[in-house]
């Protein structure tokens, strides 16, 4: 009987320590460095159809008023709020999708960082595709952590070879 009570108490404490974590405790490693926050940026959008979306983690990496700009194949820009983008994902069926970074260029001056990152979208983790995009991510460092302030994304198309051109650059 005592073993059952002790085991039950141990399980309750374990659940409380895991479920009771603050977002700072859960995701603090994601924002300690530029590499870590870019890894988290891709991780939150990658996973199998059975994996839950990581909206809390995604929100944690972005500053409160982050700007997201999506460019269509003609270069027309659409400004989207993070919450709106997340709601669109919530409303659609999750599919196996893995964003794989292909190349990155980073420029830093003080607490400001500009990241250029080419990536491809895969439907199986180890199988390459021709679905590729280029994203420009702006970060700042404040209060001991990195924040994503904005990002602009454009997908490669039959008429726009931006990823191919970016991959050729030294």
Segments and roles (model prediction):
Residues 1-25:
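Bacterial Sec-dependent N-terminal signal peptides
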Residues 45, 62, 119-121, 152-153:
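Short beta-strand segments enriched in hydrophobic/aromatic residues
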Residues 19-55, 60, 168-170:
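Short, low-complexity N-terminal intrinsically disordered segments enriched in polar/charged residues
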Residues 30, 68, 76-125:
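Surface-exposed, charged secondary-structure patches
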Residues 132-162:
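Short beta-strand edge/turn micro-motifs at domain boundaries
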Residues 79-81, 126-129, 157-165:
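A short, polar/proline- and glycine-enriched secondary-structure boundary/capping micro-motif
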Residues 49-77:
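N-terminal, post-signal-peptide region of Sec/Tat-exported proteins
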Residues 41, 56-58, 66, 115, ...:
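Hydrophobic pocket/interface hotspot
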């Amino acid at each position: 009987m005592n073993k059952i009570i002790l085991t039950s108490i141990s399980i309750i404490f374990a659940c409380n320590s895991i479920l009771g974590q603050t977002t700072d405790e859960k995701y603090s490693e994601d924002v300690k460095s530029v590499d870590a926050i870019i890894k988290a940026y891709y991780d939150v959008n990658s996973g199998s159809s059975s994996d839950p979306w990581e909206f809390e983690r995604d929100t944690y990496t972005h500053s409160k008023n982050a700007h997201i700009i999506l460019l269509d194949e003609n270069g027309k820009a659409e400004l989207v709020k993070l919450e709106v983008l997340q709601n669109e994902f919530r409303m659609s069926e999750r599919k196996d999708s893995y964003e794989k970074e292909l190349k990155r260029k980073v420029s830093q001056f003080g607490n400001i960082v500009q990241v250029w990152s080419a990536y491809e979208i895969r439907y199986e983790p180890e199988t390459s595709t021709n679905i590729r995009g280029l994203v420009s991510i702006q970060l700042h460092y404040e209060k001991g952590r990195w924040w994503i302030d904005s990002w602009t994304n454009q997908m490669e198309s039959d008429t726009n070879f931006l990823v191919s051109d970016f991959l050729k650059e030294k």
